[in-house]
Amino acid sequence: MSDIIKRDLEATRNALLNSTAKLMTDCSEPSEVTSRAIAKESGVNLAMINYCFGSREGLLYEVFRKLLSDVQKHDTEFIKIMSSGMSPKQKLTELHFKMMRLMIANYNYSQAVTKYILFNRNDDFGMESLPFIVEHFNGRKNIEDCRLIAFELTSIHELSVLRYETIKSSCNIDLTDDETLKWYICQNINRFLD
């Protein structure tokens, strides 16, 4: 592939990412951010969404992943925690706390990408918890068991974000309250890691 084609493809990817982020920020419902709306906003051929990202959902996930990555890079407190001497279990708690808080604060993104994440998660995708779980068990569980725990724990938390209003009304657990959210995460992590 020539350098010109690579630059054009990268420019197309960036236009799609930036336009999608803008549309997601401005919309009241994620369903408003259609492939056609994204293509129109970015000035890019509709087929390029599938070519660059595999699907609209893949594009939405990339936008969300970039948002999460930007928050993690610029949140000095989070960076300090992740590089501290905290136990893997404590770091896992902080990771899930940050992730769930971000997902609740950006609920439109969460609604749009959670199903995609749940159905496409694999060893390279959506398994940010795995290293902390492996380190926590330190050989007491095999890698397959650790992957299963990472999958189950992350899936529970992602589904909890989607249903946070129902959890509040049915169980009187307000996941928008930081203290309650931290408690909820600790309860779930303890179930899987103890």
Feature map (PLM): residue ranges:
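Helix-turn-helix
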Residues: 15, 23-58, 62
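N-terminal intrinsically disordered/low-complexity leader segments
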Residues: 1-11
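Short, basic, alpha-helical segments at the C-terminal edge of helix-turn-helix-like DNA-binding modules
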Residues: 35, 65-72, 78
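Hydrophobic alpha-helical connector segments
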Residues: 76-109, 143, 150
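Amphipathic C-terminal alpha-helical segment
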Residues: 101, 112-115, 150-173, 191-194
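Short, leucine-enriched amphipathic alpha-helices that occur as contiguous helical runs
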Residues: 9, 13-21
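C-terminal peripheral helix-coil segments that are non-catalytic and often amphipathic
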Residues: 134-143, 162-194
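Amphipathic alpha-helical packing segments from all-alpha helical-bundle domains
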Residues: 72-76, 114-148, 183
